[in-house]
Every structure is written in structure tokens, then in C-alpha cells.
Amino acid sequence: MVVGVAGYYGFRNAGDEAILEAIARELQARGHEVVALSGDPKRTREDHGLRAYHRLNPLALLRADLWLLGGGGLLQDATSALSLTYYLSVLRLARLFRKRVVVFNQSLGPLSPWGERRVRKALQGVPVILRDQDSLEYARRLGIPAALGADPALLLPPPPVPREADLVIPRAGVQEEALTTLYVAANHLVHEGKQVLVLLLQPGYDDEVAEVFRLHRIERTSDPRRLLYLAAQAGYVISMRL
């Protein structure tokens, strides 16, 4: 079977790329061919070895027998109502093309009242698997049948490596107060003789953090394999959602 995966792929976000890597590995291990919708199909082909099509090409939905929407946090309109419109349109169009669709290990929300109505309508008759208990309870309140799964990135095997750094700080959307606290904590650990690695996970979006931590060791990566390698080396990890 050809299985398509639609999500926030091709934008060099390490968390989303880890999700795609994990989903593709599991499906391929079961004998399925995997294709992906991507904001940068060339990069997705190079990074993951998958057939990839531009996410704005509706005819790409004809290239798979089944489409998985996810994982990640796609079903929300707190950051953008346009983003929610896009993902719900992918679901509707795939069904119009008579393709099977599954909402796969997503989180759900936050949603505006208008967004709740749109999601409830779009998911009628669609199998829904959610990655956390809060999302599952939210779905039940909305009257959306759903099952509990987990974040696909947890399926990626950690590499066997010796530990080197004592702290890894992935960052996404850090507020000023939290950033100051992290900086103080990092300096304290350095004074204790620890090695500190500041890991920036979406190149181009972390300039503020790079400036604050400019005296520390910094690495920028959107490669999930590199992220796993560095995290496996760490004695401690301080992290936020990606």
C-alpha cells in the first residue's frame, strides 16, 4: 500500500522532521511505500529518502491509497486560522478523491468556538488517534470519537553513544523570562564544571536565543537523527515542545 503523510514537513523544524522520520520508518518496516507532502519536496527527498510532493499541489493526494494527517499539533487555530483551514482542506480533498484518511497521533487544540465547529464537522467519519490524554478528553467534549496513541517521534531508536554534554537546551518560542532563567541556569552549570550545549532546532527562528547564549556552545540542526545523537549524549536535557 502507498501511504501518504501530511503535516508540517519541509520547514526545517526538528520536531516535525523527527515525526516524519519515525512514521516513515515504521510504515516501511511493514512493507508500505511512503510519500509525503512537503513545503520543500527536494529537501524531504534528500533528508528522508521519500517521494515528496509540494503541499500546495492538490493532485499529489492522488499518489497514495491512504493519507495520515500528522503527527504534531496541526488541529489548532491559536497560531493561525489559515493553517487549520489548510489541514482540514487536505482531509476533505483526500476524501473527495476517495482516499482513506486517518488523523494520526495528533494533539487537538487550542481551538476557537468557530474552529471547534469546523473540526467537529471535518472529522465526521474519520478515524482519529490523539497523542495525549488532554487532547483525548477535549475530543470527547466536542463529541469526536477518538483513540489514545502517542507521539510518533518516541519510536525513533536512540543511538548508542557515550555521554559528553551535561545539558541540552532545545528552544521553541521561549519567552523573555524563561530565556533569562535558562541563561542563569546554564551559567551556574558551567561554573560547576559542566558542559552546556544550546541546541537550536529551527534555523532562522532562534536568533534571539543565539544572541543570549553566544558565549556558550551552540549547535543549529533540523536533522532528527542529529538531534537524537546529541540528546543521547546528554546527562540532562531541558526542553520545550518543538
Identify the function of each model-found stretch.
Residues M1-L242:
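Active-site anion-handling motifs in enzyme catalytic cores
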